[in-house]
């Protein structure tokens, strides 16, 4: 869904066109941010190990990408709908947000997740 950044009031919406889905979407811009919704059955198809680091611990940061990349890959454009309506306020003033408090871990985790093998598109959901 779309969200508004506090305090700038900038509205952020997914920017996904037909060509976005060509190739490996993990290597493209991150568009599946806050307020992603999905079917439980799709979520259950994501391998548990893809939510974890090499030590078997769940990701401390960047879990949104660990969740959304595989589901977007499996669902494809036929089962994706961007919501332009603002549904979320993203508080950029929060000093505890991961990109402020744990930025290096966030960037490292993102690279690991982006380099994982993409999931295959499902025929049916």
Residue ranges, per PLM feature:
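Conserved donor NDP-sugar-binding/catalytic core segment of glycosyltransferases
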Residues: 1-15
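Catalytic beta-strand/loop signature of glycosyltransferases that borders the donor
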Residues: 1-3, 79-87
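Short, flexible, basic/aromatic active-site loop/helix in glycosyltransferases
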Residues: 11-29, 40, 44
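Catalytic core of nucleotide-sugar-dependent glycosyltransferases
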Residues: 25, 31-36, 100-125
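Short glycine- and hydrophobic/aromatic-rich loop-to-beta-strand nucleating segment
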Residues: 28-48, 87-88
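Short helix/loop segment immediately N-terminal to the Walker
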Residues: 48-59
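Acidic donor-binding loop at a coil-to-helix junction in glycosyltransferase catalytic cores
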Residues: 58-67
């Amino acid at each position: 869904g779309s969200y508004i950044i506090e305090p700038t009031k900038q509205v952020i919406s997914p920017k996904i066109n037909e060509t976005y889905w060509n190739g490996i979407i993990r290597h493209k811009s991150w568009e599946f941010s806050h307020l992603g919704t999905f079917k439980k059955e799709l979520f259950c198809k994501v391998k548990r190990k893809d939510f974890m680091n090499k030590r078997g611990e769940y990701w401390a940061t960047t879990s949104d990408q660990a969740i959304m990349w595989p589901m977007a890959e499996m669902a494809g454009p036929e089962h994706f709908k961007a919501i332009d309506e603002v549904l979320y306020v993203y508080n950029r003033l929060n000093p505890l947000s991961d990109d402020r408090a744990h930025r290096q871990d966030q960037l490292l985790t993102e690279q690991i997740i982006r380099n994982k093998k993409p999931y295959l598109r499902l025929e049916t959901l």
